[in-house]
Every structure is written in C-alpha cells, then in structure tokens.
C-alpha cells in the first residue's frame, strides 16, 4: 500500500512546484526502504514454521504397523468405491434396457394406431365423401412413417379427384349392410339365365386387389351346395379366413364386402333392365364366427369316429356297430335291389304277393334274409295272410296254402311294377255286399255276383279273423246262422236277445227293470244301515279275522293284534304307493367325474408309455359300443376306457 500511495502522491503533485517534488522524492525513497525491510522480515517468519513441520520429519516418526493399517484402510475404501460404482452401473444398464423396451412398445403401439387410423379413415370415406381433414390425417401419417403401404402420390391423387358419392347411394349402401339375411335365397332367375350371367364376376376375398375372377353361377352353386352340407360351408369359411389373416397385403373383410355390394347392387341383363338386388349371407363375411368349434372335437380321426355314435353336424343320424349277420342281410336284402319291391298290398294278398314271400321262395340262406325284409309292410310282417286262418282243420289250411301258391303265379302281374301295392283291378263292392248279406252263404252269393274262380276260393280267406255272425245281424228276430269262414265256426250261432230288445215280449220292459233296480238299491241301503248298527254295537268285527293258529301262537288281545294288522296294512299300502311314485321321481346320479370326453381319452392314449403297442382301431370300435351321449358330446366311463386300454395292448 505504501508503494501505491507513493505513486498516487507523485501523480497528484503538480509539475509546477519542483521543490516540493524533490522533497517528496526523498520521502518516497525512505518509504520504499522501510517497505523492503518489513517484507524480508515476514519471509523469514514464514520459513521458520515450514522447517519445523517438514514431511521428512513426519515420515520418520510413523511406525510400520501404522503404515500397514493405513494402507489396508485405503485399499478397503478403494474396493468399496469400486463396488458401489459397479452396482450403480448395473442399475443404470437395467434402466436403459427398460427404457428401450418401453420405446419399442411405444413404437409398436404407434404403428398399430397409425394403421388403425388409416383403416378408420378409409372406412369413413365409404360412408361419406372425403373431406380435407381426412387428407390431412393421411398426409401427416405418410410424413411420420414413409414405410406405410400407401404413398403421398395416392393421397394427392385422392385429393385432386375426390370421391363424389351421392347421398342416396350412401343410404342404400348402409341399408344393404344392415339388412342381410341369414339364409341362402332361392334364386330362380339364375336357372333360366345361366348363359347371360357367365360374364358377370364377383371379387374374391382372398385376392388383395379384389380382382380375382369368379363367375356368379359358380358362387350360387357353391352357396346351394353349402346349404346341403354345413361342413363344406365351415371349411370354406375357415380357409378364406386363414388366407385373409396370413396375407400381409390383403385388405379387411369389410373391403371385400363393400366391393361385393357395389359390384352386385344391380345385376343388369342383356336388355338393360335392372333386376333385384342380390341377397347375401352375412355369415360369409363375419369375422366373429368361431370356425374351429364345429360341434365336435376335431382332435384326431379317433374323435371323429367316436362322435359318429351320437351324430355330428355333418352326419346327424347316429351310427351303431352292425354285426356280420346284419351286413349279410343288408347285402342280400331286396331293399337294396330295385327290381324286387318290398312293399305289397295287404288287402289283396291273393293277387299281389310278390315273388319274395316265404310261400314262393325258400331256396338259399340269402333268400331267407331277403324274406325278412320283403315281408315288411304286409299284414303280420314276414307272414302270409293264410296264417291267420283258424287251424282247427290242418288239412284245410294246407290246401288253402297250396292254392294261394298257385294263384300267386296266375295273378301276379304287377310284381315288377314301381308301386306294387296299388292294384290295377277295380275293387268290386258287390262281392263284399253279397258276401255279408244276411241269411246267405259265402260261396253261393259270390258265385252269383262274380264268376272269377280264384276270387271265389279266396273269399273265405280275405278276413278270417272277423266273426260275421256278430258283426252282421239278420232281420230275423230270434237268431242268425251264417255260413262261417272256416269249418270250426260252423256251429256258432248269434244270440239276438243279447244285443236287441223286443218290448212286446215279457221281461223286456225297460221301465220295469229300472223300478226293480231301484228297489234293489233301497234294500242294499237298508242292509248297510243294519250292518253299521251292528258294528257300532261291537257285535261284528270290522277287521278281518286272523287264523286261529296265529291267535294261539301269539298271546294278547285280539284288538291289539287287529290294530297292529291294520297299521301294517296301511304301511304296506304306503310302501307300495311309494314304489309306484319312485319311477316318477327317479333321478339318475351324476357321474361327471368318472365320464371322459373324447379329447380326454385321446390325451390318455397318446400319453400312454406304450402308445405304439396300442391297437387304436380295435380300441375305437370297442369304445364306440360303450359310448354314451351327453350335453358335452360323446362320453365314456373311465373304468371302461382303462379296461379297453389294457385289453388292446399288443
């Protein structure tokens, strides 16, 4: 500070006074000398403590033990620092990985949302004209992600040429989307206009550009075939769905649906007139349908065979195992042959019994099986009408059988007809009326009315199980005796008084009989009053008496025994009534735990350690015989499954 003050003093001094300047100069020199002296003293004072606390002196004072301790502490501190550093770095690496995964998820979500936004914008265009906001959204998405499937050129092209859709067309499109039918329509116009519709084509759902040709006739044929077989519909739908899902460049099903509607809104003919709108099934275009669930477990061929027991969607009629005898019967039966009709006329068995009846064909085993089916539809199934004739006279029955055999050869003119049970000969009512006319014989009146000898002889055998004496009374008031159908019935007489009353005779007065019945009722009422009074006076025991042996063997009052007997009877009645009602209230116990589905059985078979040694075909056939139908499908008892597995191990 002295130097600076001196310099300032020199600067402040005016140059005019030289004397003062010289005096001040001498004083300045003195001040500088003093300052130098004070500086040298301060330096000496600072050097002295440094010499006292020098490092060489401290190092010489430390012991080797303290040195080792300090080095160990330093190493431990350095080790801890390195561990903390590594731990911190690992935490930071984990954070970086989590942030990277979050970033990837965000990118995937952003890409998905962009695609969804593009899809929504495109769908919105179909219901209303395109606006500027739609084009801005598409341009923004194109700038953000240039790898999208559409480009700016397409967007600019769409902006330069906007879609001009009238409001009427939009409303019609919406109505057509809303009003789909769930059944395939019967299109009768296509049968007449097959040649006209060859050129018209529908877009294919499997083609991403919707330009695959497909004639309308083929489409309608496929739709009609699909109504006959539901499996074909499901398979075709599942195949189309798989192709749509696996094709990266394919559009959604709504795009294909819209193209179908726009293409086939009006199918115009050659004359230029518009026909009706084509009705399409919404099931063909629905993505919510579960194609894998086809009412049966499509696990393997094993389950498809097992499901035949209860029937499937493709084959609703259940199939049962057929024995070898049944197979031979079906192979040789006349049902499978078109030249031998099975049904015959039961009312004119004398003229329309086919050649396959037991009376005519008893040759080989095959014809025996055939006869069991050829008799179906006739009276008595597998029996001729002659078997119903009363067999009191064996010779008469054998003769009639032989005569029918000869008559079959004469009158069997319609055996090869398509409808053998319809007779060409007219039905003669005179034969019936004359045959059942009162007081006449069967053969006499038939000869007068009809001269056909074969019909005359068979008239006895037409209805052999009806007694004409009871069914057709005569005018005679006493009795009627008609010619019977068989010799055993010749002695039967008709009691006229059993069915018809004559008021002129004695004892046939209905009013008198009514009065007599009234008197009998009064007597019975009086008798019941007397019996009730006796019961009250304990002169008659109302309970039934027990055997004397029982009374002697069991001591006690008769009243107690009777009371016990009455109570036991009541209990027995209650038990019987309970047994009658048990059938109504029977509940089959549930065995859900012990019943296995086909998929569970197949899992058990495939996981068996000796799976290669199992006879799967034999096991399947045996389980089909033991299968049961339930709400869940085909189920089999677990014990039966285990026994079958043990049985079919090679």
Curated annotation (Swiss-Prot):
Residues 92-120 are annotated as: Leucine-zipper. Keywords: Activator, Cadmium resistance, Cytoplasm, Disulfide bond, DNA-binding, Nucleus, Oxidation, Phosphoprotein, Repeat, Transcription, Transcription regulation. Induction: YAP1 expression is at least partially regulated at the level of translation. A small upstream open reading frame (uORF) retains the 40S ribosomal subunit. By leaky scanning it then proceeds and reinitiates at the functional YAP1 ORF. GO terms for molecular function: DNA-binding transcription activator activity, RNA polymerase II-specific; DNA-binding transcription factor activity; molecular adaptor activity; transcription cis-regulatory region binding. InterPro entries: AP-1-like, bZIP, bZIP_sf, TF_PAP1, Yap1_redox_dom_sf. Residues 67-90 are annotated as: Basic motif. Residues 303-315 are annotated as: n-CRD. Residues 598-629 are annotated as: c-CRD. It is found in: Nucleus; Cytoplasm. Depending on the oxidative stress inducing agent, YAP1 can undergo two distinct conformational changes, both involving disulfide bond formation, and both masking the nuclear export signal, thus abolishing nuclear export by CRM1/exportin 1. The disulfide stress-inducing agent diamide leads to the formation of one of three possible disulfide bonds in the c-CRD. Residues 226-246, 392-414, 571-580 have a biased composition (Low complexity). The modification Phosphoserine is found at residues 9, 14, 17, 204, 372, 528. Residues 22-50, 58-68, 80-89 have a biased composition (Basic and acidic residues). A motif (Nuclear export signal) lies at residues 614-621. Residues 430-537 are annotated as: Transcription activation 2. Residues 64-127 form the bZIP domain. One of its GO terms (cellular component) is nucleus. The modification Phosphothreonine is found at residue 165. SMART domains: BRLZ (SM00338). Disulfide bonds join 303-598, 310-629, 598-620, 598-629, 620-629. Residues 220-378 are annotated as: Transcription activation 1. Residues 1-89, 149-169, 183-251, 392-419, 510-532, 551-591 are annotated as: Disordered. Transcription activator involved in oxidative stress response and redox homeostasis. Regulates the transcription of genes encoding antioxidant enzymes and components of the cellular thiol-reducing pathways, including the thioredoxin system (TRX2, TRR1), the glutaredoxin system (GSH1, GLR1), superoxide dismutase (SOD1, SOD2), glutathione peroxidase (GPX2), and thiol-specific peroxidases (TSA1, AHP1). The induction of some of these genes requires the cooperative action of both, YAP1 and SKN7. Preferentially binds to promoters with the core binding site 5'-TTA[CG]TAA-3'. Belongs to the bZIP family. YAP subfamily. Contains two cysteine rich domains (CRD), referred to as the N- and C-terminal CRD's, n-CRD (Cys-303, Cys-310 and Cys-315) and c-CRD (Cys-598, Cys-620 and Cys-629), respectively. Cys-315 is not conserved in orthologs in other yeast species. A nuclear export signal is embedded in the c-CRD, with which the nuclear export protein CRM1/exportin 1 interacts only in the absence of disulfide bonds (or otherwise oxidized cysteines) within the c-CRD or between the c-CRD and the n-CRD. This is AP-1-like transcription factor YAP1. It comes from Saccharomyces cerevisiae (strain ATCC 204508 / S288c). The gene is YAP1.
């Amino acid at each position: 500070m002295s130097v600076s003050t001196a310099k300032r003093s020199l600067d402040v001094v005016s140059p005019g006074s030289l004397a003062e300047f010289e005096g001040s100069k001498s004083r300045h020199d003195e001040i500088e000398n003093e300052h130098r002296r004070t500086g040298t003293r301060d330096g000496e004072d600072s050097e002295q403590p440094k010499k006292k606390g020098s490092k060489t002196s401290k190092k010489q004072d430390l012991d080797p033990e303290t040195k080792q301790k300090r080095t160990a502490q330093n190493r431990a501190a350095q080790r801890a620092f390195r561990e903390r550093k590594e731990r911190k770095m690992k935490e930071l690496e984990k954070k970086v990985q989590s942030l990277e995964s979050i970033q990837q998820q965000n990118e995937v979500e952003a890409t998905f949302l962009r695609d969804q936004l593009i899809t929504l914008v495109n769908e919105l265009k179909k219901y209303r004209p395109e606006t500027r906001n739609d084009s801005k959204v598409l341009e923004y998405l194109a700038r953000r992600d240039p790898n999208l499937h559409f480009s700016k050129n397409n967007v600019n092209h769409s902006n330069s040429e906007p879609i001009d859709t009238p409001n009427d067309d939009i409303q019609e499109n919406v109505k057509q989307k809303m009003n789909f039918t769930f059944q395939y329509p019967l299109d009768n116009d296509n049968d007449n206009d097959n040649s006209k519709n060859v050129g018209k084509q529908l877009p294919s759902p499997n083609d991403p550009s919707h330009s695959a040709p497909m004639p309308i006739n083929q489409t309608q044929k496929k739709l009609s075939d699909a109504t006959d077989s539901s499996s074909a519909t499901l398979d075709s739908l599942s195949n189309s769905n798989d192709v749509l899902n696996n094709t990266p460049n394919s559009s959604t099903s709504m795009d294909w649906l819209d193209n179908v509607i726009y293409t086939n809104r009006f199918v115009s003919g050659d004359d230029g007139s518009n026909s009706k709108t084509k009705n399409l099934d919404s099931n063909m275009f629905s993505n919510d349908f579960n194609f894998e669930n086809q009412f049966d477990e499509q696990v393997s061929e094993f389950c498809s065979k097992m499901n035949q027991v209860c029937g499937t969607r493709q084959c609703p009629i259940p199939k049962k195992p057929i024995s070898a005898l049944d197979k031979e019967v079906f192979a040789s039966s006349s049902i499978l042959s078109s030249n031998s009709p099975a049904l015959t006329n039961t009312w004119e068995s004398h003229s329309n019994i086919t050649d396959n009846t037991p009376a005519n064909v008893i040759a080989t085993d095959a014809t025996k099986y055939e006869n069991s089916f050829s008799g179906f539809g006739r009276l008595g199934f597998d029996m001729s009408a002659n078997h119903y004739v009363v067999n009191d006279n064996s010779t008469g029955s054998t003769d009639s059988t032989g005569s029918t055999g000869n008559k079959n050869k004469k009158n069997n003119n319609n055996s090869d007809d398509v409808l053998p049970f319809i007779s060409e000969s007219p039905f003669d009512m005179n034969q019936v009326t004359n045959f059942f006319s009162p007081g006449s014989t069967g053969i006499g009146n038939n000869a007068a009315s009809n001269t056909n000898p074969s019909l005359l002889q068979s008239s006895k055998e037409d209805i052999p199980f009806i007694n004409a004496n009871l069914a057709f009374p005569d005018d005679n008031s006493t009795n009627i005796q008609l010619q019977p159908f068989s010799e055993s019935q010749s002695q039967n007489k008709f009691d006229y008084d059993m069915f018809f009353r004559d008021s002129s005779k004695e004892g046939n007065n209905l009013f008198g009989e009514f009065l007599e019945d009234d008197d009998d009722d009064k007597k019975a009422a009086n008798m019941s009053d007397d019996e009730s009074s006796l019961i009250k006076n304990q002169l008659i025991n109302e309970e039934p008496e027990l055997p004397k042996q029982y009374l002697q063997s069991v001591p006690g009052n008769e009243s107690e025994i009777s009371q016990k007997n009455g109570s036991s009877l009541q209990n027995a009645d209650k038990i019987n009534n309970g047994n009658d009602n048990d059938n109504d209230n029977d509940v089959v116990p549930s065995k859900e735990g012990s019943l296995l589905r086909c998929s569970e059985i197949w899992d058990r078979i495939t996981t068996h350690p000796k799976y290669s040694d199992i006879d799967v075909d034999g096991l399947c056939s045996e389980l089909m015989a033991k299968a049961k139908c339930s709400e869940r499908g085909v189920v089999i008892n677990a014990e039966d499954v285990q026994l079958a597995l043990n049985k079919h191990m090679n």
